[in-house]
Amino acid sequence: MTRIRRGYIARRRRTKIRLFASSFRGAHSRLTRTITQQKIRALVSAHRDRDKQKINFRRLWITRINAAIRERGVCYSYSRLINGLYKRQLLLNRKILAQIAISNRNCLYMISNEIIKEVGWKESTG
């Protein structure tokens, strides 16, 4: 009976996984079982952190807008600005507002002053 040589399918699958894990440290880039486990963990972490990144950037934008707005006066806040934008139907998202707050603060003050005039919030001291 002649010897049958193994096919290349399993080897091709393992090399594909090894290429994915080539930057991992230690046995996580050398042993097939640990490579597959680490690949699953890496993909789970990447999926989770993509959502987390969106949350973190939104939080950063809100913090930047709020800091820029509160410099003008104590009574005015981020929530009032966003409420005023919705009432006037201005389509400025938080990312754009944060960029305006950093690069061109006077423009943000002009927007907020227009909203204050239209909505009619009074400056409260105390």
Curated annotation (Swiss-Prot):
Q: Which family, according to the similarity comment? A: Belongs to the bacterial ribosomal protein bL20 family.
Indicate where this protein resides in the cell.
Plastid, Chloroplast
- Metal-binding in keyword set: no
Query: Could you tell me one molecular function GO term of this UniProt entry?
Result: rRNA binding
As for what it does, the entry says: Binds directly to 23S ribosomal RNA and is necessary for the in vitro assembly process of the 50S ribosomal subunit. It is not involved in the protein synthesizing functions of that subunit.
| Protein name in UniProt | Large ribosomal subunit protein bL20c
The Gene Ontology biological process terms listed for this entry are: ribosomal large subunit assembly; translation
Annotated PROSITE patterns? RIBOSOMAL_L20
Source organism per entry reads Lactuca sativa (Garden lettuce)
Does Metal-binding appear among the keywords?
Answer: no
Q: Cross-referenced PANTHER family, in alphabetical order?
A: 39S RIBOSOMAL PROTEIN L20
Q: Which gene encodes it?
A: rpl20
**Annotated GO CC locations:** chloroplast; ribonucleoprotein complex; ribosome
Alphabetical UniProt keywords? Chloroplast, Plastid, Ribonucleoprotein, Ribosomal protein, RNA-binding, rRNA-binding
Against Pfam families, the record matches this protein to: Ribosomal_L20
